[in-house]
Amino acid sequence: MGELVLAAKITHVPSLMLSEQLEPLKGTRDGPINALKLIGQRARERGADTFVVFDTHWISNFGFHINANPWHSGSYTSPEAPHMINDIVYDFPGNSELADLIAAETAKDGPLALAHKVKTMPVEYGTIVPMHYMNKDKAMSVVPIASPVFASVDENRRFGAAVTRAIKRSRYKAAILASGSLSHQLFENSKLGPEAWNKISSEFNRQMDLRVLDLWREGRFAEFCAMLPDYTRKCNGEALMADTVMLFGALGWDKYGGKAEQLCEYFPSSGSGQVAVEFHLN
């Protein structure tokens, strides 16, 4: 029997990698970078062999899509931000067996779910950036999962629950990573400038993000799940916060009773709100 050994909400913003090289960002993202490294270390210490990544930069329309390739490799340039993320080489194993199980388990509940083995299918930067810090040694297999922007909150919740069931049916120990922002209202072009790297675009969004972190810290997960449908819409959720909805579906939704541990300070990035939080399973 398999096991879910770790679950976390993580950041993947381009400024993480840029902060290792360029002023004025140099060194400013050490907190979240160290948080990603810590999550990777904890996954290994708990015997994880696979990262399942809910990737808000792999956008899909209809159904649920899982990258089931046995190996992921390529050179990635972001079509939305080629000036920030370009020619990033990635190379790590996949897990076709677990991907197939996730698709099969999801289909039992009704929705279309497809596990793709297509050599030309790329991996998006919502997976590539965290793997840069968590999986440089290629020791862990990776299953990227798309964010379906036309799925309802309830459909994404049920999908997350199916992922956990599939993991438990498998022979693998997996860590789930919800890779995406909290609020996600980026700046208009006219408001861009050096200071935008470290500013939020909306005080309302910032206050809502901080309220969410308070609810998590206080263990008030039923209240959070009740507000999540509104939060996704009113705070400009990245891919409608599909990753967060799937994560809480995987955790048991409003029945989750574990502890949320914030691993870095909340930080703004180009208008969005970012954080790294582990949701403990014991």
Regions inferred by a protein language model and the residue ranges of each:
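Beta-strand elements within well-structured catalytic alpha/beta cores of enzymes
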Residues: 49-55, 145, 172-182, 247
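Non-transmembrane, aqueous-exposed alpha-helical and coiled segments at domain scale
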Residues: 161-169, 174
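A structural signal for small-residue-enriched, beta-sheet-centric alpha/beta enzyme cores
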Residues: 182-190
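Glycine-centered flexibility sites
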Residues: 160, 178-183, 273
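Flexible, D/E/H-enriched segments
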Residues: 1-49, 60-158, 169, 189-282
